[in-house]
Design a protein with these regions (language model features):
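Terminal substrate-recognition subdomain of acyl/acetyltransferases
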Residues: 1-40, 45-57, 65-67, 125, ...
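Hydrophobic beta-strand residues in large extracellular and virion-surface proteins
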Residues: 34, 75-77, 83, 136, ...
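Exposed regions on extracellular, virion, or secretory-pathway luminal proteins
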Residues: 34-42, 79-80, 113, 119, ...
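Active-site rim helix/loop that mediates acceptor-substrate recognition in acyltransferases
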Residues: 49-83, 88
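Short secondary-structure capping micro-motifs at structural edges
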Residues: 63, 106-112, 143-145
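Short beta-strand micro-motifs in enzyme catalytic cores
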Residues: 71-75, 118, 195-201
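Conserved acyl-donor/pantetheine-binding loop and adjacent beta-alpha core of acyl/acetyltransferases
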Residues: 83-124
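Conserved acetyl-CoA-binding loop-helix of GNAT-fold acetyltransferases
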Residues: 127, 132-147
């Protein structure tokens, strides 16, 4: 099993692989390869090709543009050539993100202080139904955080999620915080919720907080 480096500027090199050997070995032991790329258009094409049963969300509009000057990346877990899980992240200051979300989704927005920019927004997490319940989503999220904090300049990672996923983001994905961010009467926030989901939280973690947590979570990859 292998790391497939298809990104123009981020390389998951031997040093990175050594620092995160337990996490990477978790995937390799399941017969999965890990690909990193900056081709976000292929991610959109792939997610939009899935059935509503597999991926019941609209594509996140924050990832409609290329990653030029955004320091973004896409992660794929692959069983041979078959994609079984995805994730994406990009540099996006929280204020710009909020204003962009307001333009698309009418609603009531809260004032939440998540820390000092530069910040990295992540979304487009998906695991194939055939591979759910095996910790792949959690572990790919942890890999994403390691890449953000080891390989980019960002000091904050944040994400949007429906309110009912707060426990999962705190105790599963190991974000440090999750607070109410917006009430969207029509729901259906791309990458985060369906039409029935009206209340959304913002989850976040700083680099310093993650450096402490990631030693604590290593046991999750071997248990």
């Amino acid at each position: 099993m292998a790391i497939i480096n298809n990104h123009s500027s981020i390389n998951l090199d031997a040093g990175f692989q050594g620092d995160h050997s337990e996490l990477l070995q978790f995937f390799f032991n399941q017969g999965l390869n890990i690909e990193i790329t900056d081709d976000v258009s292929s991610l959109k094409t792939f997610l939009e090709s899935l059935s509503d049963e597999e991926y019941p969300y609209n594509f996140d509009a924050a990832f409609n543009e290329s990653f030029i000057d955004k320091e973004g990346f896409v992660l794929y877990l692959k069983n041979s050539d078959t994609i079984v899980s995805t994730y994406a992240a990009k540099g996006l200051d929280k204020g710009i993100f909020k204003e962009g979300m307001k333009e698309i989704y009418e609603g009531n927005y809260e004032v939440v202080d998540i820390g000092i920019d530069p910040a990295c927004y992540s979304s487009c997490q998906w695991v194939a139904k055939s591979h759910r319940g095996k910790k792949f989503g959690m572990c790919l999220d942890h890999l994403k955080k390691n890449i953000i904090f080891d390989k980019t300049r960002f000091g904050i990672n944040y994400a949007i999620h429906k309110e009912s996923f707060k426990d999962y983001h705190i105790n599963g994905l190991h974000y440090s915080n999750s607070e109410k961010f917006a009430t969207i009467p029509n729901g259906d926030v791309g990458g985060a919720g369906e039409k029935i989901d009206k209340v959304y939280n913002i989850a976040w973690i700083s680099k310093d907080e993650w450096l402490i947590k990631r030693n604590e979570v290593k046991s999750l990859y071997t248990s």
